[in-house]
């Protein structure tokens, strides 16, 4: 395909078996894909109650791609990076390399859009990014 979309779809499949540091109510470990799905549902459900108007399309895109880098970089739990500055820097480096690879794979405006959304999520400056980050913390 023109933008190597199938490569990114194949990469995203890894999120189905990339396990997170959290467990479901039935005791089974959660995958990154399950985490992302539930965050997406939460975004739809809370959007009407937010203090400010958001672009639900942008919010959902941000939620969906925020952990795409973990398909390549793996999931390093936040509580591991809290006590290790070195591990925090390694996580940032790995994830930045991963999003740059995704951007390069997709090329053009689609690659730019995913890169920009991921960077916006990481910066936590816009209202959508703040909401997405809050949902990420709530969905553990």
Please describe what each predicted stretch is.
Residues 1-140:
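Alpha-helical, largely C-terminal catalytic domains
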